[in-house]
Amino acid sequence: MVRLIHTLADHGDDVSCCAFSAALLATCSLDKTIRLYSLSDFAELPYSPLKFHTYAVHCCCFSPSGHVLASCSTDGTTVLWSSHSGHTLTVLEQPGGSPVRVCCFSPDSAYLASGAADGSIALWNAQTYKLYRCGSVKDSSLVACAFSPDGGLFVTGSSGGDLTVWDDRMRCLHSEKAHDLGITCCSFSSQPLSGGEGLQSYQLASCGQDCEIKLWAVTITRVLGFELKYKSTLSGHCAPVLACAFSHDGKMLASGSVDKSVIIHGIGPQSVLHTLTQHTRYVTTCAFAPNTLLLATGSMDKTVNIWQFDLETPCQGSMNDPLKHFTEEWSEEDVSVWLRAQGLEDLVGIFRANNIDGKELLHLTKESLAGDLKIESLGLRSKVLRSIEELRAKMDSLSSGIPDEFICPITRELMKDPVIASDGYSYEREAMESWIHKKKRTSPMTNLALPSLVLTPNRTLKMAINRWLETHEK
């Protein structure tokens, strides 16, 4: 189910962090650099490595749109880069100038949080690059940070072992002693926990120097307010756990440890699914890709390993039309794995009984889903069609040569006036306004309720599209 498909060995010192966008992988290191790779063939981009920091780089992360990359360093700065060109967009200096240990974007790309060794946490406006709010924890370094999927709050973890929950106005909502010897990482699952009416509940994982991974339920209620509740502990590591990350469907949690191993935990009936032992020194970071089951793990052995869980064999050689090649040649089993990845496990039996392979999948319509496959649930049919449309959209954009991130997910056309919705995705303004005016208050991409109907102009993406158009005009 999981296999090593590629190893990156370009850094000259410990790998400290890795992060995915839909099309790229970013890695950073104590060697002061950030490197960018294409997910199509894992080739390093022409403008990589990115160089600005004067000391070790501790963390890197993409904005939800994938157009901006943030990196932070011992030099006391957080740098924002264009992921399309490698150009520096701005340099944010941490209040007090302390080494910055962690950074993360809010789901709507509106804010960037940066946490430092002096315990300060800065919340920046990611559009204007101005400091919005600042807070701090006492007697500890901030080493971990994660926003809730709805963007309503974020959690920080400290070297003292405390999980602290903040709202978007930097008010401290709660502080919990989570790991006796210090926290090293925390991560939210993108999938909400089931709850009653009026409840918003999300799963949070934290790990630490106590060799443990703990799962928490973070719940926001209209009546009782906020609650952080301990759920369970995942075991398996025999040394401090340095990193943890949920898969995009929330069904797996990866963890990396001083014991040099990576463990893939199942969520639900908790179990160890896989133990990966390829690294020869401490595993410092792990990250899942947002839309495919790829996992990257980084280590003090200066390497980043790429692991694949399902579907296609990586294309070797030319990648002119990889998605179309892979999808059309999917076997029936590949389609079954894809269904599970989309959260459509209940349809696996129906698809297998009707021998749906990749080619048949691409030709399914609402009529065939209802008439031929006898899928009675309108919600299930709609979710299948949306997922298939995403595959077709990516194929269309690849075949036309237009970068996928420039294509509106609703119209499947090149965006002219891109805006960021509250689900973190970018859309053509007119298409998204029409979507909302039809009283569709759910995300076109995730089908989850939109936390807000506010649309924020994506100026960075618009500039990138205009530059691309200029270079492709004949």
From Swiss-Prot:
Gene3D superfamilies membership: Transcription Factor, Ets-1 (1.10.150.50), YVTN repeat-like/Quinoprotein amine dehydrogenase (2.130.10.10), Zinc/RING finger domain, C3HC4 (zinc finger) (3.30.40.10)
Domain U-box: 401-474
Highest taxon listed in the record's lineage: Eukaryota
GO BP term, pick one: protein ubiquitination
Keyword flag Phosphoprotein: yes
SMART domains according to UniProt: SAM, Ubox, WD40
Annotated ranges, domain SAM: 330-394
Molecular function in Gene Ontology: ubiquitin-protein transferase activity
Renumbered ranges of WD repeats: 10-47, 52-91, 95-134, 137-176, 178-227, 236-275, 278-317
InterPro entries per record: G-protein_beta_WD-40_rep (IPR020472), SAM (IPR001660), SAM/pointed_sf (IPR013761), Ubox_domain (IPR003613), WD-SAM-U-box (IPR052085), WD40/YVTN_repeat-like_dom_sf (IPR015943), WD40_repeat_CS (IPR019775), WD40_repeat_dom_sf (IPR036322)
Protein name as catalogued: WD repeat, SAM and U-box domain-containing protein 1
Organism: Mus musculus (Mouse)
Gene field: Wdsub1
